[in-house]
């Protein structure tokens, strides 16, 4: 039944895409040359830099710099290993204090690419060093591939996996917690309990694969980083996002969200799944400079 439903969903998405690209305003606005140019442009990664002032966070001498990569889907394109090396080089040049990986390292739908072993991916990611370390969670593709193999590969290369786990660290003599909420491997009740147990006073970064968990973030000095949606992966002019792949509200598909006095950032990720292309949603490296909110 699940396989049948996936096929039905895939036909619906393909149908919507076909109808969209054969009618105005899409066809009239871009034309054939513009269509190809936009596809080419949308495959090149961008560096997304943000400065966040978070209520309840320390007034550090300088902001805590966090680099965030998610949804690599290595193998969704034939040149992904070369691209991943270039991305790691670009992130290293930004000198992050902390590096976080949001899951879906492997790709289970390798149209035009191929399967890349987790150890190859982890070896490349391990070249990216940071004073506070590198930490990861798993995504749905990693669980389909085999969670144990992906975890072993990451941890073999010095990248701890925080699936349903917490890690404490210190930055400029202030404590910070890091909590991981994976895409699977835990019950919904366990995830609720993990989030409910966050300190109401201690600054916490919650690393989640799916932004749906932002709805359950308790009151406190916390912010969440998530992926999974690919920012929609395809955002057509005059039509918008074709598919979000999450039960989270559509407004949580991509970018910075501020609700209830708390922040969520949902990255568009790096790779693709399903169709091996992006449109209007380029892959991105996310770099956040975080600090305490200035008192007025």
Regions found by a protein language model. Give the residues of each.
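Acidic, histidine-bearing metal-coordination/catalytic regions of metal-dependent phosphoesterases
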Residues: 1-65, 70-79
């Amino acid at each position: 039944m699940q396989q049948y439903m996936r096929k039905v969903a895939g036909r619906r998405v393909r149908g919507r895409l076909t109808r969209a690209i054969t009618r105005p305003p899409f066809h009239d606005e871009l034309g054939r040359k513009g269509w190809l140019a936009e596809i080419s442009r949308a495959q090149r990664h961008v560096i997304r830099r943000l400065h966040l002032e978070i209520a309840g966070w320390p007034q550090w001498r300088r902001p805590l710099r966090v680099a965030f990569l998610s949804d690599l889907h290595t193998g969704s394109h034939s040149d992904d290993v070369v691209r991943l090396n270039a991305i790691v080089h670009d992130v290293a040049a930004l000198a992050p204090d902390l590096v976080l990986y949001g899951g879906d390292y492997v790709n289970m739908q390798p149209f035009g690419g191929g399967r890349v072993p987790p150890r190859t991916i982890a070896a490349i990611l391990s070249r990216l060093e940071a004073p506070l370390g590198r930490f990861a969670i798993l995504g749905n593709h990693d669980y389909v591939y085999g969670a144990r193999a992906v975890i072993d590969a990451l941890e073999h290369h010095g990248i701890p996996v925080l699936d349903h786990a917490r890690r404490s660290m210190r930055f400029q003599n202030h404590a910070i917690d890091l909590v991981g909420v994976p895409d699977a491997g835990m019950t919904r009740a366990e995830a609720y309990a993990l989030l409910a147990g966050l300190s109401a006073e201690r600054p916490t970064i919650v690393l989640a694969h799916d932004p749906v968990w932002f709805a359950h973030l308790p009151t406190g000095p916390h912010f969440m980083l998530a992926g999974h949606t690919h920012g929609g992966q395809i955002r057509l002019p005059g039509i918008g996002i074709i598919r979000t792949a999450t039960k989270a509200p559509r407004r949580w598909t991509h970018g910075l969200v501020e609700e209830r006095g708390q922040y969520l950032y949902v990255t568009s990720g790096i790779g693709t799944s399903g169709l091996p292309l992006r449109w209007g949603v380029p892959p991105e490296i996310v770099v956040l400079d975080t600090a305490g909110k200035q008192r007025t």
